[in-house]
């Protein structure tokens, strides 16, 4: 008899760890509907976007600004919502 994990195709058994969804080999940015874009003229380099990103797709640059790794950004908009300077705009993703 198959356990619940095997029924779903996961083959989960005791003492195993499931692979996480956001890893270097599991690029998760391909299904987003909106893309965050920086407005560098407004950015104060506070780093809140970097701190709140659940996928760690906001990367610091040498000049103090930040950039997105769009391979992993899911477009959740948390960075834009939390930015105190309104320096991040969510734009419709072009497919």
Curated annotation (Swiss-Prot):
Domain 4Fe-4S ferredoxin-type: 34-63, 64-93
Cofactor binding annotation: Binds 2 [4Fe-4S] clusters.
Domain of life of the source: Archaea
Amino-acid positions noted as binding [4Fe-4S] cluster 2 in the UniProt annotation, renumbered to this chain: 53, 73, 76, 79
Cofactor(s), by name: [4Fe-4S] cluster
GO molecular function, one term: oxidoreductase activity, acting on the aldehyde or oxo group of donors, iron-sulfur protein as acceptor
UniProt cross-references to InterPro entries, sorted A to Z: 4Fe4S_Fe-S-bd, 4Fe4S_Fe_S_CS, PorD_KorD, Pyruvate_synthase_PorD
This protein's UniProt keywords: 4Fe-4S, Electron transport, Iron, Iron-sulfur, Metal-binding, Repeat, Transport
SUPFAM superfamilies reported in the protein's UniProt record: 4Fe-4S ferredoxins
Keyword flag Repeat: yes
Binding residue positions for [4Fe-4S] cluster 1: 43, 46, 49, 83
Subunit annotation: Heterotetramer of one alpha, one beta, one delta and one gamma chain.
Entry protein name: Pyruvate synthase subunit PorD
Annotated source species: Methanosarcina barkeri (strain Fusaro / DSM 804)
Gene label: porD
């Amino acid at each position: 008899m198959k356990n619940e994990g095997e029924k779903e195709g996961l083959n989960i058994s005791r003492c195993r760890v499931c692979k996480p969804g956001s890893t270097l080999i599991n690029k998760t940015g391909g299904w987003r509907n909106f893309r965050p874009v920086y407005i560098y003229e407004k950015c104060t380099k506070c780093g809140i976007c970097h701190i709140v990103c659940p996928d760690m797709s906001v990367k610091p640059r040498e000049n103090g600004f930040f950039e997105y790794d769009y391979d992993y950004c899911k477009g959740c908009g948390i960075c834009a919502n939390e930015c105190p300077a309104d320096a991040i705009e969510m734009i419709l993703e072009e497919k």
